[in-house]
Each structure stands twice: as C-alpha cells, then as structure tokens.
C-alpha cells in the first residue's frame, strides 16, 4: 500500500482501464482527449442555454482551449482535464441552485441530484477540490439552507474520509503524502507565519502568477460593475464570479500554484468560464452602437492601455505553452524515460533510491525508496519533523539495503544532503529543460560493493542514450580515455 497520489479518482480510473485493457502508455492520452472534448461540449451547451451568439462562444472556447492550456494538459496525461470538467460543472450547478429562492422540485430540502453526484468527485479528482466544497457549502449556509450545506459537505467528505481511514490503518497519514508535503501550511508560532496564514502567501503567489492575477482583477472589476448595476449577490453570474475569486485565494494560500500549467489549470478555465456569461450583457451587440465621447478620449486611451497590460500575461501563457510543449516531451524522453530504461535493463527487482518516482516505476520493476517522500512513509515522516539530512538519508538507505541512487544534486533538492559515504559515478544533463525537476541527474553508489557494477552499466548504457544528453563523471571519463 502506498498513499502517494493526490488524485484518488484518476488512480482508480487508470487502474480499471489497465485491468480491462492491460497496462499501456496510450490510455492517459486518450482519456485526456475525451475529457477535453467533454469540457468543450459542456461549456458550449451551457453558453447556448444563456443564448450567447456563436461568434462570442467561439472566442471564449478558443480562449479556454489555449489559455488553460489543454494541448499541454493532454500531453501531460494526468488528471487535470477531468479536474477542469468536474470543477466547471460543479460551479455551474452550484450557482444555478444558489440563485434560487427555494429548492427545486427535485428536492424537498435536499440537494439536486446533479450536485449530489458531483460533490464527491470534486475532492476525489484532486484534494484542492475541498476549497470549492468549502466555498459552496459556506454560500448555502449564508443562504440559510443549512441542511443543503451539511448534505453537500457530507457527500464530499465521506469518500476521502474512508480512504483516509484505509490509509491510516495501513500505517500512513490520513491525507496522501503528496498533499502534506506539497501544500503550504505556515508555522503559526511566529508573527511571519500568522501573516502568511492570513493571506500574505496568497498575495505573493498571485504576483508570481500574472495570468491568474489578471483574471482576478478582471472578475473583481466585472463583479463591482454588475453590483453597481443592481445585480444582487445571489444572481447566477455574481455567484460564479464569487466562487471563483474565493477558491482562487484559498488555492494560492494553501496549494501549489504552478508546475508546467498543471496545478492552476482549473482556476484559469474556471475564471474564463465565470467571466464569459455575465460579461456578454455589457457588450454592444454591434460595433456601430459604440459611441466615444471625445472630451474624455484620454480616459479611453488610458483604459485601453491598462487593459493591454492586463491581457499581456494571458498571451504570454499561450505563447509559452505552445513553445514549451515539444520541449517538455523531449525533456521527459531524454531524462525520466532514459532513467527508467536504465533501471529496467540493469536493476530489475533491486533496491534503488530516487527522488522522482513516476516514469521510473512505470517502466522498471524496482524496490523503490522515494527520497522525496511521496512513495516512502519513512522519508515523509522525517520531512514532516524537519529532520531529513545526510545522517537520516544514510541510515535509511543502509537499513533498506539500497544499492544505488539517482538524484537531483541541486538547490531545493539534495544539495548538501548527499551522505559522505556515497560515491558519485556520473551525471546526465539535458538541455532546454522546462518540465523536469532539474536538468542534471546524478548517479551514486550507495553500497560500496556496487561501484564497479554501476560504472560498467553506465558505460554500456552510454551508447544507447540520445546524443543530446551531456554525460560526465567517473564512468564517462573511462569511456573517453
């Protein structure tokens, strides 16, 4: 048992598909294409219900596709497209129900079937979904529909609570290691920690994410303008905007906000979706209807200039997503894929320590010690207590009988933490890295009796590596003598 994934639903879905069709590399890609298509169809259907014109729908669908950006998410092959789909549908149905004075005929004082079905999926697809659940439950409570709020929360929490109990009974934490180790939980024992807890972390992360910052500014302006136009708080469009804003601040406060367009993708798509419907009400139906008061022309110019500055980060995201996608696939092939092939060829069923467990464990059948802590409980416990340095790594790898280690010897990873007893056998370095943790992987001898074997294996595998990988170190110097 391993509690390593923050997406329980995606893990279950892939397991079912692999059980039926066998383990393969194509299923994640195909699933992401299917879910992206479902997103486009769902958003299109919702926009049609609001009688938005085809040209307007086309522009926003194009924006959602490339700003989110779906091409990158499809090739990543993880749960993020399904996360976007569930988040959009949940926000749409929640706002629709909250905007009503009374519960629908499908419920006496209970939730509509659509929300009851979606609520457990929201945290199951990613634990960040709990932010959405918290926001919507709070809004139902403010709406004085406490039974609705309670029911929605219970339906959402029961599945992850059952998983948490299962995890605990197996000796792991209640939450997956990935959630605990990657989340932002400030130390409230200090004044700085208290300040971070009350929004400073969110503020800093927003400044580091200009595309999210733009969306927040845009929806705040739209929300304020509509409020001044007598749009009440419980109006459908206002609700979707409010849910997006509060969820974004919670995510930026407590969660990862960037890693190759993954973690913030649902926020970007949700923000664009939340803007689209209420914004249309204030656009002129024809360009001829736009009248410009020449006496305040400088104000128009200033407003246009400000708008361009706000929109630039969005176009920058589109540009870099397109440019970086082929680079990213090359990065994974040159680093993670080659590491997996190397271990598969030479270290079958062998105890190995690594810090990036995904592709390696998919390709090779090894006894893996995850020194980053996602897949190894001993490491996670040490990192949670703040005691994880050279001594702990040396003792743990010795206890586990680890033969070799493949690590990033870089700042933020294992710089200054490599045990002195280990011997570096070599390095692989990729160029133009945009997605891997670091561009250089170091190979270490952990068990001294393995040194000659590791060097021999690296020398043999050196001729199988793509020539774009820069090899160096002890083994490579023997090749080039």
Which residues fall in each region the model found?
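Membrane-proximal envelope and lipid/glycan-remodeling enzymes
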Residues: 1-481
């Amino acid at each position: 048992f391993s509690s390593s994934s923050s997406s329980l639903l995606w893990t279950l879905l892939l397991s079912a598909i692999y059980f039926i069709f066998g383990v393969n590399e194509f299923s994640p890609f195909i699933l992401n294409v299917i879910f992206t298509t479902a997103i486009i169809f769902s958003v299109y259907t919702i926009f049609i219900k609001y009688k938005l014109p085809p040209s307007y729908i086309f522009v926003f669908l194009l924006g959602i596709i490339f700003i989110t950006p779906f091409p990158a998410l499809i090739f990543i092959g993880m749960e993020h497209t399904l996360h976007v789909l569930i988040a959009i549908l949940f926000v749409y149905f929640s706002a629709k129900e909250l905007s009503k004075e009374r519960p629908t005929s499908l419920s006496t004082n209970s939730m509509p079937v659509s929300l009851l079905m979606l609520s457990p999926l929201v945290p199951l697809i990613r634990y960040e979904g709990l932010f959405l659940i918290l926001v919507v439950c709070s809004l139902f409570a403010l709406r004085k529909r406490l039974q609705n709020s309670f029911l929605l929360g219970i339906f959402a929490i029961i599945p992850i609570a059952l998983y948490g109990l299962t995890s605990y009974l197996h000796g792991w934490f209640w939450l997956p290691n990935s959630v605990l180790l990657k989340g932002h939980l400030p130390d409230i024992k200090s004044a700085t920690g208290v300040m971070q807890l009350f929004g400073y972390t969110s503020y800093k992360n927003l400044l580091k994410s200009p595309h999210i910052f733009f969306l927040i500014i845009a929806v705040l302006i739209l929300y304020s303008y509509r409020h001044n136009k007598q749009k009440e708080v419980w109006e459908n469009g206002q609700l979707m905007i409010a849910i997006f804003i509060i969820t974004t601040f919670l995510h930026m406060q407590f969660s990862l906000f960037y890693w190759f367009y993954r973690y913030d993708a649902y926020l970007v798509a949700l923000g664009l979706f939340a803007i689209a419907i209420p914004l249309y009400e204030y656009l002129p139906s024809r360009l001829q209807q736009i009248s410009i008061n020449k006496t305040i022309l400088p104000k128009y110019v200033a407003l246009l200039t400000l708008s361009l500055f706000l929109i630039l980060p969005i176009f920058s995201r589109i540009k870099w997503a397109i440019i970086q996608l082929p680079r990213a696939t090359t990065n994974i092939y040159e680093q993670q894929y080659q590491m997996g092939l190397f271990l598969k060829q030479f270290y079958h069923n062998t105890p190995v320590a690594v810090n990036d467990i995904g592709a390696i464990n998919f390709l090779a059948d090894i006894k893996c010690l995850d020194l980053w802590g996602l897949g190894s409980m001993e490491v996670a416990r040490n990192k949670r207590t703040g005691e994880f340095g050279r001594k702990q790594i040396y003792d743990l790898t010795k206890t586990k009988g680890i033969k070799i280690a493949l690590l990033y010897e870089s700042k933020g990873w294992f710089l200054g933490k490599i045990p002195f007893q280990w011997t570096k056998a070599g390095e692989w370095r990729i160029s133009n890295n945009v997605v891997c943790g670091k561009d250089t992987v170091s190979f270490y001898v952990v068990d001294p009796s393995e040194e000659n074997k590791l060097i021999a294996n690296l020398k043999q595998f050196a001729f199988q590596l793509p020539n774009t990988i820069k090899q160096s170190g002890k083994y490579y110097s023997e090749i080039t003598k």
